[in-house]
């Protein structure tokens, strides 16, 4: 049973793992993250490396390298406690593995450390995380169409995400937001997105800082009657976002999506009944 459970977990996650491996970003990032392990463990590359082991074996970790790797594992576990999606878990592993690799390579040789940093910089400049391309029921706005749509029908409630493609938090939240749009979208409750990286004037209009240090991306705002009534995350006096986890459960609870959805459905039903009643009255008059 102890062997069966992990095996079933791997089989269940196999489609997602294959999807990641098929993406150049994840494949190259995995190779960079495991590069020190490969160099230290795989002959003949490891045979020419310096070592501080008492037995002089260059193809095994010395005590300092083991300490660094154990510290890396502890940091990853701490960071992953707040991760929401599998992509965030994998991203944390990749990021901190590269940091640890940089330290380990510099311990071996200055030239190897510089080469590794160069490869990481080239990777960051040429490879971007794949954007979410799954099903969704979301309308994308520009700086002009956003205001027009918010004012067009006061009976419709809008939840709008302000995002930037370069933000890893926005990328992680994309599948969650798409799933919410598929579940709750109706005639009286709609979902939208606007890219403040492309339309910076929108960020000024709604007081959303695009700076990574502000941690305001993504920002969700609920509009009713053309006015903002609620947003997450909130911003303190210093302009920094108050910590808030963009989980599906938090969005549903904080934005009262279940209640908004039921109200929107009732309004729609009432409108349809009124239309049918008017059509029936018009038909009687014609007779």
Curated annotation (Swiss-Prot):
InterPro entries reported in the protein's UniProt record: Thioredoxin-like_sf (IPR036249), Thioredoxin_domain (IPR013766), TMX2 (IPR039101), TMX2_thioredoxin_dom (IPR037463)
Chief subcellular location: endoplasmic reticulum
Domain of life from the UniProt record: Eukaryota
Pfam entry (one): Thioredoxin
Motif (Di-lysine motif): 284-287
Thioredoxin domain span: 137-209
Residue intervals passing through the bilayer: 113-133
Subcellular location: Endoplasmic reticulum membrane; Mitochondrion membrane
Entry GO terms, CC: endoplasmic reticulum membrane; mitochondria-associated endoplasmic reticulum membrane contact site; mitochondrial membrane; mitochondrion
A biological process term (GO) from this entry: brain development
Record GO terms (molecular function): disulfide oxidoreductase activity
Regions of this protein lying in the Extracellular compartment: 14-112
Membrane topology: Single-pass type I membrane protein
Residues of the signal peptide: 1-13
Cytoplasmic side: 134-287
Sorted UniProt keywords: Disulfide bond, Endoplasmic reticulum, Membrane, Mitochondrion, Signal, Transmembrane, Transmembrane helix
Description of its domains: The thioredoxin domain lacks the 2 redox-active cysteines, suggesting that it lacks thioredoxin activity.
PANTHER family (alphabetical): THIOREDOXIN-RELATED (PTHR15853), THIOREDOXIN-RELATED TRANSMEMBRANE PROTEIN 2 (PTHR15853:SF0)
Quaternary structure and interacting proteins, as annotated: Monomer. Homodimer; disulfide-linked. Occurs in both reduced and oxidized monomeric form. Oxidative conditions increase homodimerization.
Function: Endoplasmic reticulum and mitochondria-associated protein that probably functions as a regulator of cellular redox state and thereby regulates protein post-translational modification, protein folding and mitochondrial activity.
Protein name: Thioredoxin-related transmembrane protein 2
